Amino acid sequence: SMIIARGVDLISAGIYSNYMLIVNGLNNITNQVFNGIVASFGNLMSTSTREKAYENFKVLYFFNYLIYSFFSISFFVICVPFMKLWMGNDSLFPIATVSLITLYFYIGGMRQAVNLVRTSAGIYQPDQYFPLIETAINLGLALILVKPLGINGVLVANLVSMFLVPFWTQPYIIHKNVFDTGVKNYYLRYCVYAAVALFSLLLTQFICSHLPAMG
């Protein structure tokens, strides 16, 4: 918000904060769900084989996808009419910005299962410097892109830094150190889940756009 306020204007920063208020609220709900699973998964890893733990991780990963695809689709479809009702027409972002916010929420949320395993296994050492690298990339790109692209530039910086660092490093670390297996299957599932989520979003948006207006 500080970069947006300095690089764009205070009004846009305020509108952005309203959108992120919804996103953070959804994240708080999902965090409560996954935080409740940490101890159980940690106990599972200590009492079962790596193969059994990996099979349970795949179930958890699918559960992760179900939650975040549902919330992402709901946010994208409902966000504009909700913000129009709540804040008025002057507080709406264009569809491109809403799409970037939705993508940021989805990609960040799809890390929940990986983060849960890392926390349960207590694996922090291999990952200790990557957050600093991600932050440096994010900040540098945001400062470069905010002038030509505005808020979209800040969101693109968030997505690029997330994609360049934790998208690759965190899954690799847990698959190598916890499950002792390759990471290829993880990314294949990720692509399939993303494709299904995108199709579901487009279908939902199409259906909602053809519903008769209320009132």
Predicted regions and their residues:
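Membrane-helix interface residues
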Residues: V8-I11, M45-S48, G122-Y124, L149
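Membrane-embedded alpha-helical segments of multi-pass transporters/permeases
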Residues: M2, R6, I29, S72-V80, ...
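Short runs within selected transmembrane alpha-helices of multi-pass transporters and secretion channels
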Residues: M20, N27, N31-N35, A96-V146, ...
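Interfacial/gating helices of multi-pass transporter permease domains
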Residues: I3-N24, E51, E55, L92-V98
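Transmembrane alpha-helical segments of multi-pass transport proteins
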Residues: E134-I137, P148, N185-G215
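Interfacial segments at transmembrane-helix termini and the short loops linking adjacent helices
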Residues: L66, F76-Y106, Q112, N152, ...
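Helix-loop junctions and terminal segments of transmembrane helices
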Residues: Y19, V23-Y61, Y65-Y68, N115-S120
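Hydrophobic alpha-helical transmembrane segments of multipass membrane transporters and ion channels
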Residues: I22, F62-F70, L103, V192, ...
